[in-house]
């Protein structure tokens, strides 16, 4: 019995680690490539060791075949990837807002490395992405990440099949909402750009000899960034509230 109990405990811990590890590797913040792999692995292992005794009563017997064992592990990995990917997809709303703001203020050429996107983006998009990660930590949203990991075993127990259709629908909905939110967050700068371009067009039409381009470009950058600075508090509050609503689905 002792040998069976030990084998069963290892089996449960492996399943929990498969789900938690997949979630941690795809979640915002802790799952970024900028975080050393050892830290991410250690965090996932610690969470697995904590959760394994709590959920072992809901786990079925150890499969008698290698295929059954592999299927159980893949099942857990897919659920972890589903939850973590949805949480990361919503982070693109800030990147979208930053890209739109950069286009409206003629700053699209200013590229920088964006750790959260694992690639390059405009400087404004990178700044807003870093702002999002800061807000996650400052407003304790990362606690809801941990709550989502724990609650996932109630929403998606070991015996339930992977909800592929629901996961695909949620991913599409999250992408649509993140893009819509990105446009909304950039709305003040979009309105400013429309008014500013209309005004400069009228000035250029009235005074053709006036070199409007040399005045409009720096003025667009200064006024656009000033408006962004004034809008940051509103952007932070709206984005945090919307992200909290998304996390409520899993908590």
Curated annotation (Swiss-Prot):
The keyword Membrane applies. Disulfide bonds: none annotated. GO terms for cellular component: bacterial-type flagellum basal body; plasma membrane. The chain crosses the membrane at residues 10-30, 43-63, 67-87, 130-150, 183-203, 212-232. Belongs to the FliR/MopE/SpaR family. It is a multi-pass membrane protein. It comes from Caulobacter vibrioides (strain ATCC 19089 / CIP 103742 / CB 15) (Caulobacter crescentus). This is Flagellar biosynthetic protein FliR.
């Amino acid at each position: 019995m002792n040998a069976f109990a030990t084998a069963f405990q290892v089996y449960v811990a492996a399943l929990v680690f498969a789900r938690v590890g997949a979630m941690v590797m795809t979640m915002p913040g802790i799952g970024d490539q900028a975080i050393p792999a050892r830290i991410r692995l250690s965090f996932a292992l610690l969470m697995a060791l904590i959760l394994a005794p709590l959920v072992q009563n809901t786990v079925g017997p150890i499969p008698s075949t290698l295929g059954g064992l592999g299927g159980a592990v893949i099942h857990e990995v897919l659920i972890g990837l589903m939850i973590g990917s949805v949480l990361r997809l919503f982070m693109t709303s800030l990147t979208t807002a930053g890209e739109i703001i950069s286009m409206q203020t003629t700053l699209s050429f200013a590229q920088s490395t964006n750790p959260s996107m694992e690639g390059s983006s405009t400087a404004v998009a990178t700044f807003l992405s870093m702002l999002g990660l800061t807000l996650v930590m400052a407003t304790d949203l990362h606690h809801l990440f941990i709550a989502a990991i724990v609650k996932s075993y109630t929403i998606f127990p070991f015996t339930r099949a992977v909800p592929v259709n629901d996961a695909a629908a949620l991913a599409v909905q999250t992408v649509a909402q993140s893009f819509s939110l990105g446009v909304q967050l950039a709305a003040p700068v979009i309105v400013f750009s429309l008014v500013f371009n209309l005004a400069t067009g009228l000035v250029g039409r009235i005074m053709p000899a006036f070199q409007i381009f040399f005045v409009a470009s720096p003025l667009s950058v200064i006024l656009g960034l000033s408006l962004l600075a004034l809008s940051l508090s509103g952007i932070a509050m709206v984005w945090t509230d919307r992200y909290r609503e998304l996390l409520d689905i899993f908590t």
